């Protein structure tokens, strides 16, 4: 706990310097936190994790590094060209290199000893920046991945859903079917970015750090991939730490303070870059990550959208027209089919926004809304059979359109896990 107090205490011996730098026409603003009066200091540029971040998110660590004699640049992450649905690791890497160039010009900094530090998404970006420029003297990563972003996301989502007690078809839908569709539809930028070629190209020393209880990055796989890919490395695992190397009891909660030894390790390593490579044993994982494969020929995004529109139209169209005989099974099909499709869309939105936390109680591995949708799906199949009998007797276009909706519903529901265990 003493370490955490030191890391978060006011910077008794650190001075700030405002800097600006540009990349691709975008001006970025940052702060250099450094010990006052220092000369020939090593420098460190801190590269953000995913999402919107300002320099203040990393100030406590920058101040801790500055107290160890490291001039540390923190900056506000770009907002132009970066969002949930748009991002480029290449652009972010160039942002980091622009920050490196700005830090190397500082009078208190030794330009030959400036490196990059990257957390999470920054663990993809920082090595990419280093691979592009010899001006980057070293790389530090926290919670970095050795796998593609889509694969990491699937592993992390499954961890969260299983923690909530969920299992079965909903988990498969969220971690495979939905992610594959989002990636193919361009809604998951950089989904299939492969970090391994970049890691293999690095010649700078790399300090890779992971929490053994990380539930966002598969840490065991990451350690193994870094060890087999890098030329010069120091790989360390902190036993009671989570993704950001905060103290934790289970990987999900965040206790006060950083993992004991983390901040000091970065300081000593940066000041004395090791000539030889060392690595801790990979931490155990409950299960391995699985690749999020590209869509097959029969599951393109446009087909899923077309099926969705057709189902909504077929089920909603039937009750709008009262002409001709109305079978009870047809009324049930129109009702259950429409409610199931709309309910699925609602559940998926809640799932994406809250990572399953707002889906309510879980019964037999299924949250109640999903269980209700599965029961409605069975009812829709039964109503489709009854409607087929009614259509055979009456052969009306009204029943035919509705029956077509029921027929399309069956493979659609199987694909999305509504008719699955």
Predicted regions and their residues:
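Short beta-strand element of the alpha/beta-hydrolase
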Residues: 40-49
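N-terminal cap/lid segment of alpha/beta-hydrolase-fold proteins
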Residues: 14-38
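Catalytic active-site module of serine/aspartate enzymes centered on a nucleophile-bearing elbow/loop
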Residues: 241-244, 250-303
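The serine-hydrolase catalytic nucleophile loop
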Residues: 51-62, 77, 220
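Conserved alpha/beta-hydrolase
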Residues: 64-82
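Alpha/beta-hydrolase active-site loop
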Residues: 87-106
């Amino acid at each position: 706990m003493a370490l955490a107090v030191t890391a978060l205490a006011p910077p008794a011996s650190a001075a700030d310097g405002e800097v600006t730098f540009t990349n691709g026409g975008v001006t970025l603003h940052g702060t250099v936190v450094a010990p006052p009066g220092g000369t020939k200091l090593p420098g460190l540029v801190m590269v953000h994790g995913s999402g919107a971040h300002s320099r203040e998110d990393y100030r406590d660590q920058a101040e801790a590094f500055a107290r160890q004699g490291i001039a540390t640049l923190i900056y506000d992450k770009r907002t132009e060209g970066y969002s949930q649905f748009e991002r480029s690791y290449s652009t972010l890497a160039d942002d980091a290199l622009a920050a490196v160039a700005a830090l190397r010009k500082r009078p208190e900094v030794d330009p030959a000893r400036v490196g990059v530090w990257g957390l999470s998404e920054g663990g993809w970006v920082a090595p990419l920046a280093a691979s592009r420029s010899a001006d980057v003297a070293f790389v530090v990563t926290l919670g970095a991945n050795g796998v593609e972003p889509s694969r990491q996301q699937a592993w992390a989502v499954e961890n969260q859903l299983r923690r909530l007690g969920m299992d079965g078809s909903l988990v498969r839908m969220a971690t495979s079917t939905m992610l594959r569709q989002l990636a193919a539809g361009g809604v998951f930028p950089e989904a299939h970015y492969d970090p391994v070629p970049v890691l293999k190209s690095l010649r700078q020393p790399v300090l890779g750090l992971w929490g053994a209880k990380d539930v966002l990055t598969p840490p065991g796989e990451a350690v193994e991939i870094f060890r087999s890919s890098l030329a010069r490395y120091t790989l360390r695992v902190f036993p009671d730490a989570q993704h950001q190397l905060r103290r934790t009891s289970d990987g999900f909660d965040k206790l006060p303070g950083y993992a004991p030894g983390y901040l000091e390790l970065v300081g000593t390593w940066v000041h004395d870059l090791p000539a030889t490579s060392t690595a801790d044993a990979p931490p155990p994982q409950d299960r391995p990550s699985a690749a999020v494969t590209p869509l097959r020929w029969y599951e393109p995004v446009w087909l899923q959208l077309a099926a969705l529109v057709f189902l909504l139209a077929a089920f909603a169209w039937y009750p709008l027209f009262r002409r001709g005989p109305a079978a009870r099974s047809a009324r049930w099909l129109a009702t259950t089919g429409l409610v199931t499709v709309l309910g699925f869309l609602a559940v998926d939105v809640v799932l994406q926004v809250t990572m399953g936390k707002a889906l309510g109680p879980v019964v037999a591995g299924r949250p109640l809304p999903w269980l209700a949708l599965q029961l409605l799906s069975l009812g829709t199949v039964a109503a489709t059979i009854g409607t087929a009998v009614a259509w055979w007797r009456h052969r009306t276009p009204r029943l035919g359109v509705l029956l077509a909706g029921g027929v399309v519903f069956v493979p659609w529901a199987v694909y999305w896990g509504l008719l699955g265990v």
